């Protein structure tokens, strides 16, 4: 104990000495050679400083975006889902519907899916729980993805700042909504995502990717927009054409829900084909449920939940031994 006290005292003394030295020799003041003169109007709105790329009066409509965040020459795609899509492969997202336990999430993320469809539209967990799951196994085989609840700045930026590499946005009904979702997904100049930090920038997540996260994420993010309503069907061509939309999801359940027709009926299939036609014309990837993996032109899928995966796994493991429990005549287990 006495030794620890002496060590602590020595550290304090060294700290005080360093502080005293700094006060005796203060650092030179920071220089701002292009700053406006104190208390004066610099006229910056009307005229740029010497050497500026953007000349003339300030106008956002004609602003030439700078090169500070360009990806380095020769940068390669590091998101395996984006790469597989670009190569023409089929990608599948396994759904984590209700789990908040990182161990369950990581088991799903290493089970063989391309990405994890973390469900936030129909689940009440918070973003803190999601961020904790994602940072537990960031280098799992399946990259973190999420279906957000709606297309707004707060929802999508929570997802991205936590490390999402696949963003699924539901119920896109118009070109304006498609652009809104795109804007919050991408950094400028394509979008309006704020550069505010978050665990996505950490070295334990994507901070160490080749070329830098801020510089390369626009080329690596996957944005999937869902058409689920009659209004969305009417605007399908315009939705699919929005730059930055990677794929369009034909929502098998809600297109039935909003149309009033069951899968297989002519009216239902017409709705699905409207999404198909718009997506193919736009040169985008077409997504649907895993049951449609053999349907023409569908190359992106949502698979079942972690609960369904557990049930399937147990059934496969037990085989003929499944559901062969003894049946007591009495007690709580009597049937």
Question: What are these model-derived regions, one by one?
Answer:
Residues 1-4:
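Positively charged n-region of N-terminal signal peptides that target proteins for export
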Residues 7-16:
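Bacterial N-terminal signal peptides
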């Amino acid at each position: 104990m006495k030794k620890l006290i002496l060590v602590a005292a020595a550290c304090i003394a060294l700290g005080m000495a360093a502080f005293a030295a700094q006060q005796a020799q203060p650092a030179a003041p920071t220089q701002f050679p292009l700053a406006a003169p104190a208390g004066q109007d610099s006229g910056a709105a009307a005229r740029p400083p010497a050497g500026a790329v953007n000349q003339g009066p300030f106008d956002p409509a004609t602003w030439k975006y700078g090169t500070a965040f360009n990806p380095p020459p020769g940068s390669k795609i590091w998101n395996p889902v984006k790469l597989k899509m670009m190569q023409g492969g089929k990608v599948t997202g396994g759904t984590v519907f209700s789990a908040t336990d990182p161990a369950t999430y990581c088991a799903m993320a290493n089970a063989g899916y391309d990405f994890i469809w973390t469900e936030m539209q129909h689940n009440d967990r918070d973003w803190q729980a999601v961020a904790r799951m994602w940072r537990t196994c960031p280098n799992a085989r399946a990259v973190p993805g999420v279906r957000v609840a709606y297309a707004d700045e707060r929802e999508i930026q929570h997802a991205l700042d936590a490390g999402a590499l696949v963003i699924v946005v539901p119920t896109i009904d118009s070109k304006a909504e498609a652009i809104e979702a795109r804007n919050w997904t991408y950094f400028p100049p394509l979008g309006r995502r704020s550069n505010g930090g978050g665990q996505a920038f950490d070295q334990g997540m994507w901070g160490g990717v080749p070329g830098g996260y801020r510089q390369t994420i626009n080329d690596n993010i996957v944005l999937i927009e869902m058409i689920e309503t009659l209004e969305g069907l009417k605007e399908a061509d315009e939705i699919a054409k929005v730059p930055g939309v990677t794929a369009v999801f034909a929502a098998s359940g809600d297109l039935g829900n909003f149309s009033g027709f069951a899968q297989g009926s002519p009216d239902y299939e017409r709705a699905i084909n409207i999404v198909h036609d718009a997506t193919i014309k736009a040169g985008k990837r077409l997504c649907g449920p895993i049951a449609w993996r053999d349907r023409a032109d569908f190359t992106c899928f949502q698979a079942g939940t972690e609960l369904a995966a557990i049930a399937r796994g147990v059934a496969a493991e037990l085989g003929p031994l499944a559901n062969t429990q003894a049946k007591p005549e009495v007690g709580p287990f009597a049937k």
